[in-house]
């Protein structure tokens, strides 16, 4: 068949399409949080509408929650208003909510998969850019704006133009201490922050097939950072084993029936991709960003680009601006540059697999005296599992702060922020100017490299 995985899901959810209007597709799962939903609820009230299908809508608190306390009253003024508003809205419209008192609360793109809400073949939307995370399950998942949130509330549908198809096949032998975060940063460096614009990117190849679901989620999470609408991976036995016995997986069919259905969710051998890349990752070293967008990446033992070597004027100007903001110089190495904070968390790297990697690095060691380091699990269940395994003790003995679940320092929307000019080694997904706090300097990397940075208090290359 010539139909891609993306096209199969789009077509199976198509409600209406003609030459003169934007196609309308059905939405299987609508995830919401406290930041982008209030205005949408207000719009419903103004128009005297109800949420069309509350059982296909699910809410959590994550973006601006305190990670020190589970009390709403301990958060900032606006955060308190938003969380209390979410509670009221969910009660008024009969939407299930994981609030701060619930062990299942967490980052929306962590709890959806771990609860089994996200299933192969689904359409999933959320008022958040990194909804593409759910594409790791063979779902069509993408972020939407607040007006679209209201539209989905009211109709359980969305107007959505068809995207083009891009495939990125990843192959090679993964070297020691190379993780999915390194792979996706390397790809974004090659493709650029706008290379995926107008596309849904299907990730495939021998490396993807061997990845855990946690690693696949990291890959799809950052597809948006290359400008793509979404990232997607065909489901397989690894997907099915992850989902088996999850809370929200419907029980109205046998497991074999689900697998038989999901096995059809794949691109055919003759599927057409407008762009088709093959990337060998055998050679890559741990990756780190040096600038203010996720494509400004070098190996940890590499050097920042030299300005005169950059032919494109716009790219050269962006590079100059990024270097000035980051307090760095062209042609230099990041090695031995001191760091102020280390943040391990976010919807990119806050799952149990990530925390186990960090624990393996820092066990029986101490972080550097100049470092403030925090580890923020992606959900209450991740926190519970980590504590069951004794990882929290390893972290605290090493000098890390062990927090409650939330988005935390990924974005400057809660108490966890950088001070001006502080430099942070972060496992999050965006290194934009001010992303982690006004004038804060963010370097993106894997949990493994972030843990090493915490131990040494500076950027290091461990061969």
Swiss-Prot record:
GO terms for biological process: L-leucine biosynthetic process. Its EC number is 4.2.1.33. [4Fe-4S] cluster binds at residues 347, 407, 410. Binds 1 [4Fe-4S] cluster per subunit. Pathway: Amino-acid biosynthesis; L-leucine biosynthesis; L-leucine from 3-methyl-2-oxobutanoate: step 2/4. GO terms for molecular function: 3-isopropylmalate dehydratase activity; 4 iron, 4 sulfur cluster binding; metal ion binding. Heterodimer of LeuC and LeuD. Belongs to the aconitase/IPM isomerase family. LeuC type 1 subfamily. PANTHER family: 3-ISOPROPYLMALATE DEHYDRATASE, HOMOACONITASE, MITOCHONDRIAL-RELATED. This is 3-isopropylmalate dehydratase large subunit. It comes from Buchnera aphidicola subsp. Cinara cedri (strain Cc).
